[in-house]
Amino acid sequence: MKILIVDDHPLIREALRHVLAVLDADIALIEAQNFAEGLAAASDNPNLDLILLDLGLPDADGIDALTELRRHYPAVPTVVLSASEHPATVMRAIEAGAMGFIPKTTSSHLLLNALRLVLSGGVYLPTEVLRQHQGTPEPALRLAVEASDGGKMLTPREIGLTARQADVLALLVQGKPNKLICRELDVAEGTVKIHVTAILKALNVTNRTQAVIAVGKLGLQLRQI
């Protein structure tokens, strides 16, 4: 397993080295202390499994850096590390394509669980931040919070999705538009639109960003495509 850490704080990188060592027996960690180094490292290591990106880099706006990484490396899940837990920051990161948002105050145990979820195709979001942002959630999201609190992880089938809709959702949470989804799944774009409509209805949300939030709350482990 190969992970790129982009963070300008040496102590944070050192702490991550110790924590991530137990994630995989054959782990390789590549480190960069600014965004320019991070882009170069990503280019030099084409088989990355995960990118951990600090939003507070000295040489780039955090969301702009995330957007650029997603544009160049859409197949590599990127998880945001941030000193901020503000709901607006979480939302901006998710809208930019992050597959996870982990506050730097997160415990080592929770960090590892979050990364395992992302590596298995899921999305990790801090539940308490989402609760604050959502206020009174829609029924499907309320069910998701309850499932998260109780340790139970719902499957796509349990929320009424077919296997094909689950595949569409897996690509949707990666930030891919309908044209790319239909190409990767070899189906008509009109069919993808029908599936997306069904997915939003099943999650009781109205747009893709809300769908990603719902996936994070449900802890859905979607198939990696």
Model-identified regions with their sequence ranges:
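Conserved active-site segment of CheY-like receiver
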Residues: 8, 81-85, 104-106
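Acidic, metal-coordinating helix/loop segments flanking the phosphotransfer/catalytic sites
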Residues: 33-50
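Active-site residues of response regulator receiver
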Residues: 54-55, 82
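The feature encodes the CheY-like receiver
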Residues: 58
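Short amphipathic alpha-helix used as the core "switch/output" element in two-component signaling
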Residues: 63-75
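Short, flexible helix-to-coil linker/hinge segments that flank and couple to helix-turn-helix
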Residues: 90-94, 105-156
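Recognition helix of helix-turn-helix DNA-binding domains
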Residues: 175-210
